[in-house]
UniProtKB/Swiss-Prot annotation:
This is Nucleolar protein dao-5. Keywords: Nucleus. May form dimers. Interacts with RNA polymerase I. The gene is dao-5. It comes from Caenorhabditis elegans. It is found in: Nucleus, Nucleolus; Nucleus, Nucleoplasm. Residues 180-190 have a biased composition (Acidic residues). PANTHER family: NUCLEOLAR AND COILED-BODY PHOSPHOPROTEIN 1.
Length: 971
């Protein structure tokens, strides 16, 4: 009899006894028949015979000791075991694999048991007892898992029982895989072997199957990367008892990862050795990688840092599996180093589990890897190599922070992922690809990361902010620092990604302070991450690199928008380190909490904080809702406004929120570029790049403006208050801060880009339709950033679109500044029309209308139409009414009583002219008709009543339907 059959028979009999319901799910009919027949002829040993009670007890003891946090570990283990089961399933060659898949699905039940067994490698045996449930889920997986995972070293000793033969066959295969995997983790695996061998020995066949699976899960969870590399790593988990944290992190990461893609793991495990390859894989295997990433994390297990990274990488996995939450607890223990790496590895792990181990061993490499990884996420597709260079050791922590910020929104989504997220974030690039899955993950990590990130405030924070987006594009961050030119390119890409990134990783903003170019790129990445995380769109990473992907981003953004809101909140926690910035953020946090990430970034840009704060303050009132803090970054991001703008449009919803902020922030006009940016950043936070772009490209700014105006429409709607403030503040600063961009923009941009505005307005308008909300926000940003001239245009766009209400308020100011206003007004008004929402929102359109005369363009016409639609329309109606009234009254005002319409037979169609009763089929009707036909008026009613009340004296009543079908032509 084949070892597989024997093992299956043991499992089958055990499961049928303990949890019969699972049998049908784990074994198909053919298999069941086969096993039944086999069991008739041969009596399969029982688990009790294979595994002694005393081993179970031992294991149990170990289990409890192995993790003081059994629940967490168990959960993680559960997930990991689950994934293991699936993994094993993948390894399995037999048809059992199918059952495995089922088992994986069912892992919930098995998982519990498995959780126990997996919770501690040692506890696996006892878990086995419980395993019955577990067994079903893992049976195939277990067997094969056992063989595959046990094959490492577990199986051989455990197999001593009948299992030896049983599992031996599978072992080779599993072992092979494991071997490749275990090669990297040979040490761990060896240790695990020794450890495993002892407990496992007793666990033969059936037990081993489950145990192995459980163990595998445990090891996978504990040695997520080890596991991946070597299920044998299980022992390591046992060993790692001291490393419970690591284990847990891994476990959690494994849990979700395993759950997600246990199958993918094996391949990733192999891939691990080749980070580059893995990276490639990682992009393609973003989801797969997640599962593999888990394994890789396991590898990292020996190396706390790596492990944590794994944990973080698992974070995204965790995202999928709340089990990851427990991991956070453990993950916390190995804070900085681990976290940094973990963060960098987090996304990397997801994408390149292999990379993770490397990072663990060599932080420098991890950074590079991270860079790659992050670059992988957005750049991976584009230029992972470039990013590695930027990757710095510090970046990791920063990455973490970035993760944290990026995670902030993610955190909201998946608090569980938090621990892992923190780590996962670091490898945003990879993560980015995985980002969608990581998005929630990041959220969780964000929380943790902030705490840790705090330690490395200056570099980390700066980097962190940069990392925020950098996390996704660490390379971008580093590279920008190293290579400004690249930053630009990157920035553009990042810019587009920034829009959402900003929301997600305002931290990037602070970095901008450090490196204006970088921030943008980072931000782009960050934003890319935010939405990427949520959506996992590969396009996003690309978009980070290539503005062209804004569309994709936009889609992402929409998802990001909600995501970002969550992250923003978390990010603020991070931001805490920088009081000033934070304060601004704080105010902005009130409503900005939704987008604290942006704030965090501002926090980082402490230098700008004061100005920002002021802007933040005024803008915060209403902008708080949106993220005034982000503005600082905007200033930096300025360079990549164009790209950002695209992103901005992408960030329609995001921008809306930011847009509001933007007006607020521009308090100081002098900082105008920056502050405007800052104000614009508020929305720019979400769309920092937008502003930046305006500075660089006035034309773009105009375009942006239009877009912004349209997007602002929502923003304006959202935050008319802020705009009102602008009204009050005619001064540039005040205008900037209060009007935000409204008066500021008007004043500044007024003279500036009328020409540009007009042409771009068209484009913008188009954009605005697309990015109605988004563009508005970006527009605001853009204006802020635009060079004075550009700023004028931008601001105008910003003020006009951003502050549609502002615009109108501003327009008053605009009117005040006729010279400037005229060009601006045109643009603005055009934008105003673009931000029809804004105009609609605010009765200011009339104001807008006032400047309108100055705008002589389609813009004016459009705006006029809009305001007209509001005010003019109303006015028009009155006029029409007055004229019509006279005529109407003349006709109507004859004091004549209401009279019935006189119908002449000529006006009735032939079909209906004869209204006579057709009595040839209805005697009763005929009789009634005779009496009723002669009567008209009140008498008819009387006659009819008599007929109704009288006794029926006719024949059968005809119940056929004699109605007439009217056709349209028969009117």
């Amino acid at each position: 009899m084949s070892s597989d059959l024997y093992a299956n028979a043991v499992l089958y009999s055990e499961i049928s006894q303990r949890n019969p319901e699972l049998v049908s799910k784990m074994f198909n009919e053919a298999t069941r028949k086969k096993l039944d027949a086999f069991l008739k002829d041969n009596e399969a040993p029982k688990l009790k015979d294979i595994v002694t009670d005393n081993v179970f007890k031992k294991r149990k003891r170990i289990a409890s000791s192995s993790g003081n946090e059994p629940p967490v570990k168990k959960m993680a283990a559960k997930d990991s075991s689950d994934s293991d089961s699936s993994d094993d399933g993948a390894v399995k060659k037999n048809g059992v694999q199918k059952p495995v898949n089922v088992a994986a699905k069912k892992s919930a039940t098995p998982v519990q048991k498995k959780a126990e067994s997996s919770s501690s490698s040692d506890s696996d045996a006892p878990a086995k007892k419980l395993t019955p449930v577990k067994k079903p889920a893992q049976t195939p997986a277990q067997k094969k898992a056992a063989s595959s995972s046990d094959s490492d070293s577990d199986d051989e000793p455990p197999k001593k029982a009948p299992a030896v033969t049983t599992k031996v066959a599978p072992k080779p295969m599993a072992k092979k895989q494991d071997t490749s995997d275990s090669d990297s983790d040979s040490e761990d695996s060896d240790d695990g072997k020794s450890k495993k061998a002892n407990p496992v020995k007793v666990t033969p066949v059936a037990n081993v199957l489950q145990k192995v699976v459980a163990k595998k899960a445990a090891s996978s969870s504990s040695d997520s990367s080890d596991d991946e590399k070597k299920p044998a790593a299980k022992p390591t988990p046992a060993k790692p008892t001291p490393k419970p944290v690591v284990k847990k992190a891994e476990s959690s990461s494994d849990s979700s990862d395993d759950e997600k893609k246990p199958v993918a793991k094996p391949a990733p495990a192999k891939a691990t050795p080749k980070p580059a390859a893995k990276k490639a894989d990682s992009s393609s295997d973003s989801s797969d990688d997640e599962a593999p990433a888990k394994k890789t994390p396991a590898k990292a297990a020996p190396k706390p840092v790596a492990k944590k990274a794994e944990s973080s990488s698992d974070s995204s996995d965790d995202e999928k599996k709340p089990a990851a939450k427990p991991t956070p607890a453990k993950a916390t223990p190995k804070p900085v180093a681990k976290k940094a790496e973990s963060s960098s590895d987090s996304s990397d792990d997801e994408k390149k589990p292999v990379a993770k181990p490397a990072p663990a061993k060599a932080t420098p490499k991890p950074v590079a890897k991270k860079a790659e990884s992050s670059s992988d996420s957005s750049d991976d597709e584009k230029k992972p190599a470039a990013k590695p260079t930027p990757a710095k050791a510090t970046p990791k922590p920063v990455a973490k922070k970035a993760e944290s910020s990026s995670d902030s929104s993610d955190d909201e989504k998946k608090p569980v992922a938090k621990p892992t997220s923190a780590k996962a974030t670091p490898k945003p690039a990879a993560k980015k690809a995985d980002s969608s899955s990581d998005s929630s993950d990041d959220e969780a990590p964000a929380k943790k990361t902030p705490a840790k990130a705090a330690p490395k405030p200056a570099s980390k924070k700066a980097e962190s902010s940069s990392d925020s987006s950098d996390d996704e594009k660490p390379a971008a961050k580093s590279t920008p620092a190293k290579i400004t030119p690249k930053p630009t390119a990157k920035k553009v890409a990042s810019s587009s990604s920034d829009s959402s990134d900003d929301e997600k990783k305002p931290a990037a903003k602070p970095t901008p302070a450090n490196a204006t170019p970088k921030p943008v790129a980072k931000k782009a990445e960050s934003s890319s991450d935010s939405s990427d995380d949520e959506k996992k769109p590969v396009a996003k990473p690309t978009s980070a690199k290539a503005t062209p992907k804004p569309a994709a981003k936009k889609a992402d953004l929409s998802s990001d928008f909600s995501d970002d809101e969550a992250p923003a909140k978390k990010t603020p926690a991070k931001a805490a380190p920088k009081p000033a910035s934070k304060k601004a953020e704080s105010s902005s946090d009130s409503s900005d909490d939704e987008k604290p990430a942006a704030k965090s970034t501002p926090a980082k840009t402490t230098p700008k904080p004061t100005a920002k704060k002021a802007a933040s303050s005024s803008s915060d009132s209403s902008d708080d809702e949106k993220k005034p803090v982000a503005k600082p970054t905007s200033a930096k991001a300025t360079p990549k406004p164009a790209a950002k703008k695209a992103d901005s449009s992408s960030d329609s919803s995001d921008d809306e929120a930011p847009a509001k902020k933007t007006p607020v922030k521009p308090t100081p006009v002098k900082i105008v570029a920056k502050k405007v940016d800052s104000s614009s950043d508020s929305s720019d936070d979400e769309k920092k790049p937008t502003k930046a772009t305006p500075v660089k490209v006035t034309p773009k700014s105009v375009t942006k403006k239009a877009a912004a105006s349209s997007s602002d429409s929502s923003d304006d709607e959202k935050k008319p208050v802020v705009k009102q403030t602008p009204n009050v503040v005619p001064k540039k600063e005040k205008a900037a801060s209060s009007s935000d961009d409204s008066s500021d923009d008007e004043k500044k941009p007024t003279a500036k880009p009328t020409p540009k505005a007009t042409p771009k307005q068209s484009a913008k308008k188009a954009d605005s339709s697309d990015d109605s909300s988004d563009d508005e926000a970006p527009a605001k940003k853009t204006p802020a950033k635009s060079t004075p001239a550009k700023t004028a245009v931008k601001k105008e766009a910003s003020s006009s679109s951003d502050d549609s209400s502002d615009d109108e308020k501003t327009k008053k100011k605009s009117a005040t500044t006729p010279a400037k206003s005229t060009p601006k007004t045109a643009l603005k008004k055009a934008e105003s029309s673009d931000s029809s929402d804004d105009d609609e929102d605010l009765p200011k359109p009339s104001k807008a209308v006032t400047p309108r005369p100055q705008r002589a363009d389609s813009e004016e016409s459009a705006e006029t139409e809009e305001s007209s639609s509001r005010t003019p329309a109303l006015k028009a109606k009155p006029l029409a009414t007055s004229t019509e009234k006279a005529v109407y009254e003349n006709r109507k005002r004859k004091s004549s009583p209401f009279r019935r319409v006189q119908m002449t037979k000529d006006s009735v169609s032939e079909k209906f002219r004869n209204n006579q009763h057709d009595s040839h089929f209805d005697q009763w009707g005929q009789r009634a008709n005779e009496s009723l036909g002669k009567v008209v008026g009140k008498a008819f009613r009387h006659e009819k009543t008599k007929k109704k009340k009288g006794s029926y004296g006719g024949g059968p009543i005809n119940q056929s339907i004699n109605s007439i079908k009217f056709s349209d032509s028969d009117d």
